[in-house]
Amino acid sequence: MTSPDTGGDREKVVTKLTSALRQDLKVRAALHGLDMQDAVEAGITAWRGLGSNPAAVDTSGAETYSTFLPAGLWDDFREDCKNRGVSLTQGIAQAVSIWLDINPVPEVKRPAMVRRIVVCNQKGGVGKTAITAGLGEALAEDPAALVPVRVSKHFAALLEEDDRPEDPLALEDLPGLGQRVLLVDFDPQGHLTRQLGHELLPMGGDSLTNHMAGDGKGELSDLIVTVDESRFGDRLHLLPACTDAFLLDVRIASVRAREAALERALRSVEGDYDVVLIDCPPSLGISMDAALYFGRRRDNEDAGNSGALIVVQAEDSSADAYGLLTSQIEDMRSDLALDMDYLGLVVNHYDARRGFIATSSLQAWMDIKDPRVVGVVGDLKEQKEAVRAKRPLLAYAPRCEQSIAIRALAREISK
């Protein structure tokens, strides 16, 4: 059945397609940056060019499916199906299958140099751990699946007029980013480790602290565990915390080039990943210097590939803490002649219902411009529930507002 498309050059066609083929078509077309109708057109064209019928495709359970094709193509395809002795349902199934075969899942683009993202703020309670975990999850999601992404409405509403999306509330289904991610729990309190359902490393055993102090008892890679959720495959790993990190500053105070202690410790494993995320403690001590040094811009590294991602809240005390942190970063830049990039500000736990303090503070963060706000994440129940369940947020509630906002953040800092 056909009916003219309002554009005049395409017509609507209605056929049948199994739900599995329809889903594969939707995902694969998105992965290749195509509209589904263009993929169907290409599949039909390829099918018509074959010298003989391909293998039959299982069409049991096929349901009504409509798309738009160039005027006349469907009639020609119908005639070809008749001449080849196959039904339209079988013909379109074969055409879609052919297109899927000749357009495999594209390989994930890997960064030229491992990205090192230092998630920081010396103020506790701003949600650094939740942002670290969520960002790592968003970066590691399945590249062969579509996930919902939307710019936070509070963020979008404050963008410059020229940058504002047509509908900031509209969801867009995009492929997962498929990055290989290492989360490093650099906070001796171990919140990141526990939130993801793992145990802290035992005192007296091996730990990141030992490796930073030059006293490692084995391979650092032996301490790394997998965050075992199907949507992340084997792409999301965790280096758990150990409470011996409370003594880290003392342990590395006399170490040669102590600011490079974290970099030396992670050197043996960083090459296995596309992104390394450091969940920093609420501290401005030597350990924070080591984290910032790890996130500096290395020789021949593009600006903005690595750096500091600062988590704040829409309230006054966050502004005071932000000033202390940026002073430390600027001191390191000056004292060690480092190139240290700011990846941006994340305003976390935002709730406009808290009134003028929240909304005016958000506006103040937006007005800074350098570093700019790269994400606004709401204060909603799903994150707390995920922590209670000891599961990653994006696996526990993949379509909740927080998950969607964090995916937008991951894409914003991956540009």
What role is predicted for each listed range?
Residues 2-13, 27, 37-38, 48-65, ...:
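P-loop NTP-binding core
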Residues 18, 24, 33-35, 43, ...:
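N-terminus-biased targeting/localization segments
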Residues 18, 69-70:
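Hydrophobic loop/turn residues within beta-sheet-rich immunoglobulin-like superfamily modules
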